[in-house]
């Protein structure tokens, strides 16, 4: 299974990912951060069409190469950031629409292999030196991710769950979801 943790910056995805220990699963990287650090790819409000396609294609590659993976973010996230960039003229609408279509195609083709876990905004942003600290930007991204998650649920029949509450409550809910989906934790 591909367990995809999705949500805007600073919503607790990485915290939960780092607490999961599932035999046979690899921990995927947060692709945008990795590409930014290793290749200088522009992210957040500074992104552009080239950077978004690099990030998108890297996620597709990572999901295609790994049967069992826990991913910090997914295609719904990349498409949300791309929509923001299109509204700012930093990405073409044609490129955005093509990416959104490819997102739907990927999720439809892999619908039986994906568990989508959505993290809404519940916490104040913490400055880690990489994430954007702009609250309006985060709120925009959070809303667009939520729309994308709803769309893939309807279009592709993807199982999607929302995690809320304290870290302890989120882990209890995550354990329940994994048990429900037949994924055994250590």
What are these model-derived regions, one by one?
Residues 52-111:
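Glycine-rich phosphate-binding loop used to anchor ATP phosphates in small-molecule kinases
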Residues 18-61:
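Conserved substrate/cofactor phosphate-moiety recognition/catalytic segment
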Residues 5:
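Hydrophobic anchor at the beta1->P-loop junction of P-loop NTPases
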Residues 32, 73-75, 117-123:
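Short loop/turn segments at strand-loop or loop-helix junctions that form parts
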Residues 13:
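Conserved lysine of the Walker
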Residues 85-168:
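A glycine- and Lys/Arg-enriched "phosphate-lid" helix/loop adjacent to the NTP-binding pocket
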Residues 10:
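Walker A (P-loop) phosphate-binding loop of P-loop NTPases
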């Amino acid at each position: 299974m591909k367990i995809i943790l999705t949500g805007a910056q600073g919503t607790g995805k990485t915290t939960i990912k780092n607490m999961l220990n599932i035999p046979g699963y690899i921990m995927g990287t947060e692709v945008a951060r990795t590409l930014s650090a290793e290749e200088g790819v522009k992210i957040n409000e500074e992104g552009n069409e080239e950077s978004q396609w690099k990030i998108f294609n890297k996620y597709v590659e990572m999901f295609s190469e790994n049967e069992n993976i826990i991913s910090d973010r997914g295609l719904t996230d990349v498409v949300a950031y791309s929509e923001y960039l299109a509204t700012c003229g930093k990405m073409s609408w044609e490129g955005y629409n093509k990416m959104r279509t490819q997102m739907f195609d990927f999720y439809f083709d892999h619908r039986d292999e994906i568990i989508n876990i959505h993290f809404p905004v519940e916490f104040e942003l913490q400055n880690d030196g990489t994430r954007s600290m702009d609250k309006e930007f985060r709120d925009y991204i959070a809303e667009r991710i939520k729309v994308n998650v709803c769309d893939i649920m309807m279009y592709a029949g993807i199982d999607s769950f929302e995690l809320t509450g304290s870290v302890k409550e989120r882990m209890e809910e995550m354990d329940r979801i994994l048990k429900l989906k037949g994924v055994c934790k250590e």
